[in-house]
UniProtKB/Swiss-Prot annotation:
UniProt-listed InterPro entries: Ribosomal_uL10, Ribosomal_uL10-like_sf, Ribosomal_uL10_bac, Ribosomal_uL10_bac_type, Ribosomal_uL10_CS_bac
Name listed for the protein in its UniProt record: Large ribosomal subunit protein uL10
Keyword Ribosomal protein in annotation: yes
Job description of the protein: Forms part of the ribosomal stalk, playing a central role in the interaction of the ribosome with GTP-bound translation factors.
GO BP term, example: translation
UniProt organism field: Picosynechococcus sp. (strain ATCC 27264 / PCC 7002 / PR-6) (Agmenellum quadruplicatum)
Family annotation (SUPFAM superfamilies): Ribosomal protein L10-like
GO cellular component annotations of the record: large ribosomal subunit
Taxonomic classification: Bacteria, Bacillati, Cyanobacteriota, Cyanophyceae, Oscillatoriophycideae
Gene from which this protein is expressed: rplJ
Length: 175
């Protein structure tokens, strides 16, 4: 038995709510995936703050209708579509999907939308090669730490150099 109108309206509202906070949505063809594999994909996406929604293309069309940011996704709505919706950490979500696809070899990335711009599958894959948010934080913290360490070494070096110079002069005069 199909879903009731209330169920469909609830699903559309849920998709709209997810899209409200999303940075990236990409569409995959999930044909041939088992329920266990879809659950595995969802579990891989969850730590990245991303979601996998499976809905009829018409329901996704209704969910994005009137929202200029997500309009380009309509061109990707065909066949069996799963919608991967990523929040802040786009790179981690794409990496999680790429790992899943490598493990299952069953899905096809059609494309996606980011900030109102349609993206090809190659562009989305390139996003997965970027460092994650945590990696960027680590790189920034390391750079800041390196600068402060160099300043501290420089500040400590001035009195040390002065002391060595005074000692060398005093030893030279004593000799």
């Amino acid at each position: 038995m199909g879903k009731s109108l209330a169920d469909k309206q609830e699903l559309v509202a849920e998709i709209k709510d997810l899209l409200k906070d999303a940075q990236l949505t990409f569409v995959i063809d999930y044909k041939g995936l088992t329920v266990a594999e879809i659950t595995d994909l969802r579990n891989r996406l969850r730590p990245a703050g991303a979601y996998c929604k499976i809905a009829k293309n018409t329901l996704m069309h209704i969910a994005v209708d009137g929202d200029e940011t997500w309009q380009p996704v309509q061109s990707l709505l065909k066949d069996s579509s799963a919608f991967l919706i990523a929040g802040e950490d786009v790179a981690s979500a794409v990496k999680a999907y790429k790992e899943f696809r490598k493990a299952t070899k069953k899905t096809e990335l059609r494309g996606g939308v980011m900030e109102g711009q349609a993206l090809t599958s190659d562009q989305i894959e390139a996003l997965g090669d970027l460092p994650t948010k945590d990696q960027l934080y680590g790189q920034i913290a390391g750079a800041i730490n390196a600068v402060t360490a160099k300043i501290a070494i420089g500040i400590n070096e001035v009195p040390g150099s002065l002391a060595r110079a005074i000692k060398a002069v005093s030893e030279k005069e004593a000799a």
